[in-house]
């Protein structure tokens, strides 16, 4: 089962429903509505979905931003349905996002992953990411 990757330009009910099923496997955040997903895309985010046999089984968001040191890219909210893991979905999604970031001129792609996501961290290292000696801080506002 080889996954196919698509960039979502206009969120359909199918995409919103799939995200409502997938996102709880990653986070306790409330899944976005169609209009919120449209705002992410309109704001410069690129939303990818992965399909196996026509069904959406994974997604990620690629965000690009320009700062004085260049165009940077972040991969966020990578999630693969538990039932589809081990089929190359995460790898295909990440490689598609990296290709898109490169095509758009980014000079680096960053992502974060919790330590306990052992398989995900192994994947990121296998496809060329390296851990940075950095600490990520967060402040809720």
What spans do the regions from the language model cover?
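Conserved beta-strand in the GNAT
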Residues: 49, 55-64, 74, 79
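Conserved GNAT acetyl-CoA-binding A-motif
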Residues: 101-113
């Amino acid at each position: 089962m080889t996954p196919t990757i698509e960039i979502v330009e206009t969120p359909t009910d199918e995409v919103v429903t799939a995200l409502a099923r997938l996102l709880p496997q990653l986070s306790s955040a409330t899944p976005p509505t169609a209009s919120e997903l449209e705002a992410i895309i309109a704001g410069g985010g690129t939303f990818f979905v992965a399909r196996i046999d026509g069904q959406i089984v994974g997604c990620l968001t690629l965000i690009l931003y320009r700062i004085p040191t260049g165009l940077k890219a972040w991969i966020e909210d990578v999630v693969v349905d538990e039932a589809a893991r081990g089929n190359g979905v995460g790898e295909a999604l990440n490689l598609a996002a990296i290709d898109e970031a490169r095509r758009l001129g980014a000079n680096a792609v960053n992502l974060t992953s919790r330590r306990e996501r052992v398989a995900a961290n192994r994947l990121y290292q296998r496809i060329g990411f390296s851990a940075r000696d950095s600490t990520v801080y967060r402040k809720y506002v």
